[in-house]
């Protein structure tokens, strides 16, 4: 599995597994989404790639740094902004991911860390 290519509901589910949830991708009305099973509560939507309320605690706990980078595109300098999510302050894991969406970059970093540490197996 190439973590850098994960997106959407698939990425959401891998983040959920990294966070210790039982998760699965389900399809309803032609839309795929990640559904987690929360003990004593039941099923819930889980979309860390779209919800900063979910990703902010992950960023703080895992000591991730998130910053923008303006790149040169075919339209000129500063017309393409990507976001870098980096585990530079984490003493046990060092890596970085980039994406046009900051939460996607951070979610990919969380999945990569969980795989490297053995929290989730692929």
Model-assigned labels for residue ranges:
Residues 1-122:
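Glycine-rich anion-binding surface patch
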């Amino acid at each position: 599995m190439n973590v850098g290519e994960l997106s959407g509901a698939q990425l959401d589910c891998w983040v959920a597994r990294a966070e210790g949830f039982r998760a699965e991708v389900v399809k309803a009305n032609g839309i795929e989404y990640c559904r987690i099973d929360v003990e004593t509560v039941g099923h819930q939507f889980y979309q860390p790639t779209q919800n900063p309320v979910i990703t902010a605690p992950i960023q703080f706990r895992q000591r991730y740094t998130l910053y923008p980078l303006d790149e040169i595109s075919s339209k000129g300098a500063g017309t393409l902004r990507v976001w870098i999510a980096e585990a530079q302050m984490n003493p046990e894991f060092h890596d970085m991911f980039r994406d046009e969406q900051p939460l996607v970059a951070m979610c990919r970093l969380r999945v990569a860390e969980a795989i490297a540490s053995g929290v989730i197996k692929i």
